[in-house]
């Protein structure tokens, strides 16, 4: 039954569909609990510099980002990192290997959104706990001399984790988003933009042009206060070919992508995603992408 209104009554128009609002722990608190060590900082810095050189043609090694789809378990992540660290050291002359440490999952509809959003995988959504666990994992992996890569989904989470990230991705669902382009323009690490889920390359090229430029957007300070962030632009951005309606890792697709990038006045810098549309979401096909 509806509520009767009188000419003098004022209807409530604020937060009508909000069930609850909880305070988020400030980044500075998490930094005090999990301060960056010299070893972790050196790992991140060295990897960023190596990737910068690769992107600008000063290092002929290949950049490889490898790891699980997303992190869901601390022990499993540490075991994987220990094994990968040995491989990274073994192949360091030819490859710059980063571990894929993804804590957030963009969803087409609904589903588990990642370790930060729901660290216990039980729909309790203990985000403060998830943020702390994410930083702990990044710190410990970097201390194995293994640099980390992740996907950025919002403008707040990076204030808790970005100092431990050597390379970042903007996903196919968010490459066209103005907010994510603005965020990329201020990130301290190199950033890859994926082509659209339908294979559209133009949105990734436009994203790079945008991220190269300065922007102003809303985020939070390390003290947790809402703030206006002004960026300088990020010169270390590139395209990621991830497939779409059809794979786009073949020579013709790569040549077409390079031509479109060059047409926009940008350096033709590409990464190929072995998964997603390029492997038709069948993990056994990933090595076929690699071999091509």
Task: Report residues per predicted region.
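Glycine-rich anion/phosphate-binding loops
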Residues: 71-91, 124-136, 287-291
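Active-site-facing alpha/beta catalytic cores
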Residues: 2-4, 8-15, 94-249, 253-254, ...
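Conserved, mostly hydrophobic/aromatic
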Residues: 67, 272
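Short, contiguous, helix-prone interaction/anchoring segments in small proteins
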Residues: 59-65
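N- or domain-start disorder-to-order transition segments that initiate the globular core
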Residues: 14-55
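Acidic (Asp/Glu)-rich catalytic clusters
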Residues: 55-58, 85-92, 136-145, 230-231, ...
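A contiguous, surface-oriented mixed alpha/beta subdomain in the mid-to-C-terminal portion of proteins
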Residues: 238-244, 256-271
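Glycine-rich, N-terminal phosphate-binding loop and its surrounding beta-alpha-beta segment
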Residues: 61, 73-101, 107-111, 115
């Amino acid at each position: 039954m509806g509520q009767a209104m009188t000419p003098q009554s004022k209807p409530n128009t604020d937060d009508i569909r909000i069930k609850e609002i909880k305070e988020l722990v400030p980044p500075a608190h998490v930094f005090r609990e999990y301060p960056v060590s010299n070893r972790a900082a050196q790992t991140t810095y060295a990897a960023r510099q190596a990737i910068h050189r690769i992107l600008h043609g000063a290092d002929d090694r290949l950049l490889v980002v490898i790891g699980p789809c997303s992190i869901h378990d601390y022990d499993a992540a540490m075991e994987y990192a220990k094994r990968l660290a040995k491989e990274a050291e073994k192949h360091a002359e030819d490859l710059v290997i980063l571990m894929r440490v993804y804590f957030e999952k963009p969803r087409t509809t609904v589903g588990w959104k990642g370790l930060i959003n729901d660290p216990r995988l039980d729909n309790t959504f203990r985000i403060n706990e998830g943020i702390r666990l994410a930083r702990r994992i990044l710190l410990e992996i970097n201390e194995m001399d293994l640099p980390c890569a992740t996907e950025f989904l919002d403008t707040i989470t990076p204030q808790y984790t970005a100092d431990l990230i050597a390379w970042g991705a903007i996903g196919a669902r968010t490459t066209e988003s103005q907010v994510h382009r603005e965020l990329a323009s201020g990130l301290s690490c190199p950033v890859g933009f994926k082509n659209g889920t339908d294979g559209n390359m133009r949105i990734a090229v436009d994203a790079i042009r945008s991220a190269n430029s300065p922007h102003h957007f809303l985020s939070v300070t390390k003290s947790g206060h809402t703030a206006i962030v002004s960026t300088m632009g990020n010169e270390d951005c590139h395209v990621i070919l991830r497939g779409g309606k059809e794979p786009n890792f073949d020579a013709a697709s790569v040549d077409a992508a390079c031509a479109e990038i060059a047409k926009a006045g940008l350096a033709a810098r590409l990464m190929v995603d072995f998964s997603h549309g390029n492997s038709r979401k069948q993990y056994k096909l990933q090595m076929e992408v690699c071999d091509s």
